[in-house]
Curated annotation (Swiss-Prot):
Keywords: Cytoplasm, Endonuclease, Hydrolase, Magnesium, Metal-binding, Nuclease
Binding locations of Mg(2+) 1: D10, E48, D70
Protein name per its UniProtKB record: Ribonuclease H
InterPro entries: RNase_H, RNaseH-like_sf, RNaseH_domain, RNaseH_sf, RNaseHI
Record bears the keyword Magnesium: yes
Predominant place of localization: cytoplasm
Residues given in the record as Mg(2+) 2 binding sites: D10, D134
Superkingdom of origin organism: Bacteria
Enzyme Commission identifier(s): 3.1.26.4
One GO BP: DNA replication, removal of RNA primer
Oxidoreductase found in the keyword field: no
Cofactor note (record): Binds 1 Mg(2+) ion per subunit. May bind a second metal ion at a regulatory site, or after substrate binding.
Lineage: Bacteria, Pseudomonadati, Pseudomonadota, Gammaproteobacteria, Aeromonadales
């Protein structure tokens, strides 16, 4: 039986594009793990994707994951839009290249390892774990230890 993990994610970008950060909060029984990282120049959508990727990558074995995000872009992208993008060779309905394809490929790879159920929560609506992720992501975006987002612009 797979371990049941609850994962909350959020991304932040100050300027969009600008300095950004992501955060993930993972909960397994009484255990809690918080992840966050900042980047020098990125976008909000990239940070939302990175949050989900980082959370899933941090799991050392396949798990049953209840992933909650405040990003409709991430939730709809991975549950609906990705199927059409793959069929069209990573092009949109308008035949434009899919933005952030490097991260969509990573996220698609990660969800193959896990049984992921996707949930959406309205951002800044008082949900405690989403608010915590927002705080961690903003702090990461402001931190001195920001990395370079090698995929931006993609």
């Amino acid at each position: 039986m797979l371990k049941q993990i609850t994962l909350y994610t959020d991304g932040s970008c100050l300027g969009n594009p600008g300095p950004g950060g992501y955060a993930a909060v993972l909960i397994y029984k009484q255990h809690r793990k918080e992840l966050a990282q900042g980047y020098e120049l990125t976008t909000n959508n990239r940070m939302e994707l990175m949050a989900a990727i980082a959370g899933l990558q941090s799991l050392s074995e396949p798990c049953q994951v209840r992933l909650t995000t405040d990003s409709q872009y991430v939730r709809q992208g991975i549950t609906q839009w990705i199927h059409g993008w793959k069929k069209k060779g990573w092009k949109t309905a308008n035949r434009e290249p899919v933005k952030n394809v490097d991260l969509w490929l990573l996220l698609d790879s990660e969800i193959q390892r896990h049984d992921v159920e996707w949930f959406w929560v309205k951002g800044h609506s008082g949900h405690p774990e989403n608010e915590r992720c927002d705080e961690l992501a903003r702090n990461a975006a402001l931190a001195d230890s920001r990395l370079i987002d090698s995929g931006y612009p993609s």
